[in-house]
Amino acid sequence: MAKIDLSKYGITGATEIVYNPSYELLFEEETKSTNEGYEVGKESELGAVDVMTGIYTGRSPKDKYIVVDENSKDTVWWTSDEYKNDNHPMSEDVWAKVKDIAKAELSNKKLFVVDAFCGANKDTRMAVRFIVEVAWQAHFVTNMFIKPTAEELENFEPDFVVYNASKAKVENYAELGLNSETCVAFNITSHEQVIINTWYGGEMKKGMFSMMNYYLPLKGIASMHCSANTDKNGENTAIFFGLSGTGKTTLSTDPKRLLIGDDEHGWDDNGVFNFEGGCYAKVINLDKDSEPDIYNAIKRNALLENVTLDENGKIDFADKSVTENTRVSYPINHIENIVRPISSAPAAKNVIFLSADAFGVLPPVSILTPEQTQYYFLSGFTAKLAGTERGITEPTPTFSACFGQAFLELHPTKYAAELVKKMEKSGAKAYLVNTGWNGTGKRISIKDTRGIIDAILSGAINTAPTKKIPMFNFEVPTELPGVDPAILDPRDTYADASEWETKAKDLAARFNKNFVKYTGNEAGKALVAAGPQL
């Protein structure tokens, strides 16, 4: 192992450097009685350690910055008054000051340094060095990223360095023109990330995802916020795009298939590959019987976040008093059915967009044309039901470009173009699957959704009789094995079909209004015809 010298990063006086600690050592460090505040880890009844992340129980998008310089100024998709996103500009001068705060915080301390890879493909992976002062943060990245072999560690040269100074604050933030004492900043030229005043583990995970989303498409590789799996022969690859709560993790974790990964993937000339070495699953209301794979992954070496334990370490998965965003990170080998030894598979044959439509308009499955594929990918639609106390309240739509707008560093059309190129080359087909509601006022059953996914993956959908749905011009099957035929045309689920039409007009208008932002260039204008026609 190379001797770790942190002085080249401006971090001096380290009292001890714990390098790539083992799980045994991490457990010992996390559960030490001398730990204070959010350093404290508690052992749960299942063997996994539970930690709290303080006021930040999710990412802090208003505090995300990218340094504006020669390399980034014309490539990054910057936020603007007209179209807001999370890529806020930061000057090189402010970056230097923020980095100084992190360096000062990390100097003269006991530190943990974890070297790991982001990306299962050796040609394009990013070697990342994480410098942290909290044991469980080292545990988190050990779970979530890909472990180098002993040989790879011998000559490990980081492509990217992450400084996690979660205990520090940007006290002079107003003077620096920042949003708050919290700062998550990226420098694309120096290949560095600085994290200040947030303990949320996901900032390190999604930070590196954002950087892969910057570098890979510029090399002609599709970078995707999706889950992916393949058949037992490792041949029939499928990818599942979808926003939080649409079923990405649940539907890709399938006992009949092998999981490639549950959240972040690339697609190059060799096929689809995972960026990660672990999974970061939501555990609110986790039920042992309906999600056994995730439940069984919660054991020693897994790390729970913001989950409530009693004094005996008993977990209450239903308790959302800290946050609804309770999570667990675990190494991917905690799931039995995974692609081994490398999380990759050939090019995808099927691309599935998951939308949970609370308006009750979209069919449970639509077969998309290439133009519709781009349109619905750029739209990135899902909808939640706000406050479903009694009866259905107002659905709130979310349009998140490429089903992952928060992590896009380039213009969304770049990601759409790369995806379409890869799909054309492999002959992949795309489907829009609604895991949300229909005219019955109930959510489409997971049994029917799984039947739909099975029909897509087996190819049965390609020989099914179809019809066209008006307004959206969707081609939908009229029968599929194992699926209730009465739900396939959403109009049939309403007592009065005109009610569907009223809701469909409303939703179609929302799609059209959202898509205006992509019509600034010819490629975007050409796709308008693939959207709903009123």
UniProtKB/Swiss-Prot annotation:
GO terms for biological process: gluconeogenesis. InterPro entries: PEP_carboxykinase_ATP (IPR001272), PEP_carboxykinase_C (IPR013035), PEP_carboxykinase_N (IPR008210), PEPCK_ATP_CS (IPR015994). GO terms for molecular function: ATP binding; metal ion binding; phosphoenolpyruvate carboxykinase (ATP) activity. CDD domains: PEPCK_ATP (cd00484). Pathway: Carbohydrate biosynthesis; gluconeogenesis. It comes from the Bacteria. Mn(2+) binds at residues 206, 225, 263. Gene3D superfamilies: 3.90.228.20, Phosphoenolpyruvate Carboxykinase, domain 1 (3.40.449.10), Phosphoenolpyruvate Carboxykinase, domain 2 (2.170.8.10). GO terms for cellular component: cytosol. Keywords: ATP-binding, Cytoplasm, Decarboxylase, Gluconeogenesis, Lyase, Manganese, Metal-binding, Nucleotide-binding. Its main location: cytoplasm. Its cofactor is Mn(2+). It holds the Pfam family PEPCK_ATP. Substrate binds at residues 59, 200, 206, 327. Belongs to the phosphoenolpyruvate carboxykinase (ATP) family. Involved in the gluconeogenesis. Catalyzes the conversion of oxaloacetate (OAA) to phosphoenolpyruvate (PEP) through direct phosphoryl transfer between the nucleoside triphosphate and OAA. This is Phosphoenolpyruvate carboxykinase (ATP). It comes from Lachnospira eligens (strain ATCC 27750 / DSM 3376 / VPI C15-48 / C15-B4).
